[in-house]
Design a protein with these regions (language model features):
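Residue-level "micro-hotspots" composed of small/polar
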Residues: 1-23, 35, 50-56, 76, ...
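Cytosolic signal-transmission helices at domain junctions
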Residues: 297-301, 724-794, 798
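Loop/turn residues immediately N-terminal
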Residues: 34-38, 72-75, 117-121, 153-157, ...
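Asp-box/WD-like beta-propeller blade repeats and closely related beta-sheet repeat scaffolds
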Residues: 83-109, 115-119, 127-138, 381-382
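Cytosolic nucleotide-binding catalytic cores of signal-transduction proteins
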Residues: 636-678, 682-702, 794, 800-808, ...
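Residue-level detector of Asp-centered blade-edge/turn motifs that repeat once per structural unit
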Residues: 23-26, 61-63, 107-109, 143-145, ...
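Conserved beta-propeller blade signature
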Residues: 28-31, 65-68, 111-114, 147-150, ...
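Short loop/turn segments that connect beta-strands within beta-propeller blades
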Residues: 41-44, 79-82, 123-127, 160-164, ...
């Protein structure tokens, strides 16, 4: 049986039902799904929907287009310049729908035919022509020998010619059953497969039924879809019973997958054979991939348990499991349980014409389907190796407690004997080319055991609890190209016979540090190893090993035995130990053929510092692709067999070259510098062969304008202007500072001068004040002197008048004297008095005259005397007026000055300024 991989809706996160499948020129797979279109390259599922969110019933890949059919719509998906899938409808807007749902799309002679159960539509690349005939409704269209054949509903097989159906085979030929597949065979023969009536062969116009060994099974299963796997293998997908393969040379069933033995669902909705000759099965629930293009198969043996060992001899396969031992007749394909081997069995070996089984109870021999225990009181036989050194031939057995040895006697292996000197449970062991036994403890530790020459006891036992400073782990012991190798802590080690110490072993190349736990010899140039990822076929050389083929653990769909050795090589075949089955590999490689598929760039994305995403154009026609400093590339290369492919990336630009190798088709470059870049990518198999060509993608991270040459020129100019401006500003600042200093000095000098002038002015003011004070005193003195003089003159006058009365002087002389005294006195006094008074009292007379121009000179004199606070009597003496006259003058002044009666005239004049 070919191996199978199932994908359910939880794997691809889309609808359950898948109605159709196709593959484009790049090798990418497409599936018509309830929710839209699924796209798969072996690494990633992508999903696309129609504008109406409809079910996609049919698909056809042609060039760069994926034609799709749905309810009352059909068209195609195509990638735009950025790699994004966009839909283009071809549905003729003038066509009146008959509830058409496009179930089938074929291409014949450059025309694309979209077929529903009512009509078909012919698309010649430019125009769509609909065809509808209510009396002839198509059930299915087929491409046969460059022509279109049609199975009509309730009709026969017709040839479609110029829009008309020409009957080739009437419906009664197939008992009104529908034909589900038509294939052109050699020698002009045509194969027809019906829904329930089986297979038919048409030669010319003659149609004859073909009988197979499963005719009844096909009638019950209901054939729904068919595919031609190769020239001699027909695939039938059924409604009720999964997928069957028929050999067209013998018309016998080759294999059959349904839900009971690995297919995810029994209802097949479509079949497709890809470029790698693998079979894709679109199911009513999920998708199954049957790896018919691989040299891998699996023998499903439900209920046998986990396989621990096997051997093949004379087309009989003996299988040791954790439940029993089984014999499988490879010719009759019959499996039989070997009696007496119930329970755990660690190995089965064919040595010296005898079958040995390492059972949990003891070692046993097998004859046919029966076993017999060897005489032994020791439980558990875990490993058995042939010792053929120093002209001695024996078998050495490891048990739960010690080692035992078998010697031949008359061509038969005799009773085992215990090898003394050692006691411990051993899981597996190997014998090196010096006869030393290297044994792995059942749980932990490694032993180096030296045998005596007669093989009866151990002369030296050395124990290695671990090979590094970490925690103790389990050892595995294996033989790689004649050298005993130990696996411990993820690395490989061997014993250096010259330096007598354990050293790292690098004979498996890069795999030497990947946790290898088992190996199996093929020949001097090749061997198998097993690690956590799966099985590796290694091409060995003198110093190193190069992986040639990888088989993933998961590809068989069943658990593998990771306890110890899990491989057996027989001839050109390698068998792998599984749970409830055995995997089989034929040949020496499963690497893809160079050029089978094409490597292409799926997405190119750039992000700025704010994580804003922008998709870059990826078509070759696009030029001047600009990005930001972070670039993300996603490649696509079909890898449906889970091969270990290497993607090699190179980025050149900005004066550096970045190279990286990865198992992932995704790579990102962050914090790139400005400049032009060239990104190249290739994909390689384990042998280093380049697959799918090379991707070359050029892009640039343009220098922003603020860092361009013109910007730098601008910056230089601005710098020049700035420096010039600064120099000017600084120079002006110095000038202004010097000017300020000079001005300050000048100001200080002026202030000093002003201070001196102020001091002089103050001194002058003091002098003036002193002078004014002196003048005031002088004025007051004059007033009082004048008053005293007046009083004296009054006395003189009285004396003169008295002389007149006595006749001593004439009246005329007296009057003359008195008049002279009066005039002289008045002019001199008032001239001096007015000058001094005006100085002391701040222009009193002028201000009084300006404000009260109606005042007379005498009024002004009276005002001055009042300001000096003289009483009426004194004023009368000054003015030669009587007291009543002075009172009259005071009254007139009060009226002229507008002084109210309640205010003192003297106070008013004292306060006047």
């Amino acid at each position: 049986m070919p191996i199978i991989t199932n994908y359910n809706s939880f794997a691809y996160h889309f609808g359950i039902q898948n109605w159709s499948c196709t593959q484009d020129e790049r090798g990418t797979m497409y599936f018509g799904n309830n929710n839209g279109m699924l796209v798969f390259d072996g690494y990633e599922w992508n999903k696309f929907t129609l504008p109406n969110k409809g079910i996609i019933r049919s698909l056809l890949a042609d060039g760069n287009r994926i034609y799709v059919g749905s309810y009352t719509d059909f068209g195609y998906f195509a990638r735009n310049s950025k790699g994004e899938m966009t839909y283009h409808s071809l549905w003729p807007s003038q066509y009146k729908s008959h509830n058409d749902e496009i179930w089938n799309i074929i291409k014949v002679n450059g025309h694309i035919y979209f077929q529903s159960f009512c009509s078909y539509f012919d698309f010649d690349g430019k125009r769509v022509t609909p065809y509808y005939n209510s009396k002839q409704l198509p059930f299915w269209l087929y491409q046969v020998k460059g022509e279109v054949y049609a199975q009509l509903i309730n009709g026969g097989i017709c040839r479609l010619h110029q829009g008309k159906y020409q009957t080739i085979i009437p419906a009664k030929t197939f008992h009104s059953d529908n034909v589900m597949g038509i294939y052109s065979l050699a020698q002009g023969k045509t194969l027809l497969i019906t829904h329930k009536q089986g297979l038919f062969l048409m030669e010319g116009t003659k149609v004859t039924p073909i009988h197979t060994n499963i005719d009844g099974e096909l009638a019950q299963s209901l054939v729904n879809r068919t595919a031609l796997l190769n020239s001699h293998t027909l695939i039938l997908g059924t409604i009720k019973n999964g997928v069957l393969a028929i050999d067209l040379r013998t018309f016998q069933k080759v294999w059959h997958y349904n839900k009971t033995n690995g297919l995810y669902n029994n209802t097949v909705l479509n079949l497709y054979v890809d470029k790698g000759r693998n079979l894709w099965v679109a199911l009513d629930n999920g998708i199954s991939l049957i790896h018919t293009g691989l040299p891998l198969s699996v023998m499903n043996m439900e209920g046998i348990g986990m396989v621990y060992g096997m051997t093949i001899n004379n087309n009989h396969m003996y299988i040791a499991t954790n439940q029993s031992v089984w014999q499988y007749d490879m010719n009759a394909q019959k499996l039989t349980n070997v009696l007496g081997c119930e329970g755990q069995n660690w190995y089965v070996e064919y040595l010296g014409n005898q079958y040995f089984v390492g059972n949990n109870n003891c070692i046993k021999t097998v004859d046919g389907t029966n076993s017999a225990s060897l005489i032994s009181d020791i439980n558990g036989s875990t490993d058995l190796k042939e010792y053929h050194l120093f002209e001695q031939h024996a078998l050495i057995e490891a048990t739960y407690t010690n080692f035992r040895i078998f010697h031949q006697n008359n061509g038969k292996w005799g009773t085992p004997k215990t090898i003394s000197g050692f006691t411990a449970p051993i899981r597996e062991f190997e014998i090196d080319n010096t006869g030393v036994i290297w044994a792995a403890h059942m749980s932990k530790g490694l032993y180096r055991l030296t045998l005596s020459k007669d093989l009866s006891h151990f002369t030296h036992v050395q124990y290695y609890p671990s090979l590094n400073k970490g925690p103790e782990e389990m050892f595995h012991v294996m033989n790689i190209n004649g050298r005993v190798v130990f696996s411990y802590g993820g690395g490989l080690y061997t014993f250096d016979d010259i330096h007598k110490k354990i050293v790292p072993y690098n004979g498996c190349g890069k795999l030497s540090k990947t946790g290898i736990i088992a190996s199996s010899f093929i020949d001097k140039s090749q061997f198998w190893v097993l690690n956590n990822d799966g099985f590796w076929l290694i091409q060995s050389n003198e110093q190193n090993g190069q992986p040639q083929t990888f088989i993933s653990n998961s590809i068989f769909g069943q658990e593998i035995n990771s306890y110890g050795n899990a491989m057996y090589v027989h001839g050109n075949s390698t068998y792998f130990f599984l749970n409830d089955g055995i995997g089989k590999f034929e040949g020496k490689t499963i690497s893809q053929k160079v050029g089978l598929y094409k490597l292409y760039l799926k997405e190119a994305i750039t992000k700025d510092k704010d994580n804003t995403v922008r998709y870059l154009p990826i078509t070759h026609e696009q030029e001047d692709v600009t990005s930001m400093g972070n670039v993300f590339f996603k490649l696509s290369y079909p890898n449906f067999n889970n091969e270990k492919l290497k993607f090699c990336y190179t980025l050149k630009g900005n004066g550096q070259t970045l190279c990286e190798t990865s198992n992932s088709p995704v790579i990102s470059y962050n914090n790139l510098g400005y400049g032009d870049y060239t990104f190249t990518a290739t994909v390689q198999n384990l042998s280093g062969e380049k697959l799918g060509g090379q991707i070359i993608y050029k892009f640039s991270y343009p220098t922003p304008f603020y860092l361009s040459i013109w910007a730098w020129i601008g910056y230089a100019f601005l710098l020049y202007v700035g420096v010039y401006t600064y120099i000017r500003w600084h120079t002006n600042k110095i000038v202004r500072r010097n000017q300020k200093i000079a001005a300050a000095k000048l100001m200080a000098q002026k202030m000093k001068t002003l201070e001196q002038e102020r001091i002089i002015a103050e001194q002058q003011k003091k002098l003036l004040e002193n002078e004014l004070e002196l003048k005031g005193k002088e004025t007051a003195s004059m007033a009082f002197d004048m008053l005293a003089l007046k009083n004296s003159m009054g006395g003189v006058k009285e004396q003169l008048l008295d002389g007149v009365r006595r006749g001593t002087i004439s009246t005329r002389d007296v009057n003359k004297i008195l008049m002279q005294m009066k005039d002289k006195d008045t002019d001199l006094f008032w001239s001096t008095f007015q000058n001094n008074f005006d100085l002391i009292h701040k222009r009193f007379f002028r201000n009084l005259h300006e404000k009260y121009p109606e005042l007379t000179t005498n009024d002004m004199k009276i005002c001055a005397l009042l300001r000096l606070n003289l009483n009426t009597k004194d004023i009368a003496n000054f003015t030669h007026l009587s007291i009543r006259g002075v009172e009259s003058v005071r009254y007139r002044l009060r009226k002229k000055l507008g002084i109210p009666t309640d205010k003192s005239l003297t106070d008013f004049l004292i306060e006047f300024e």
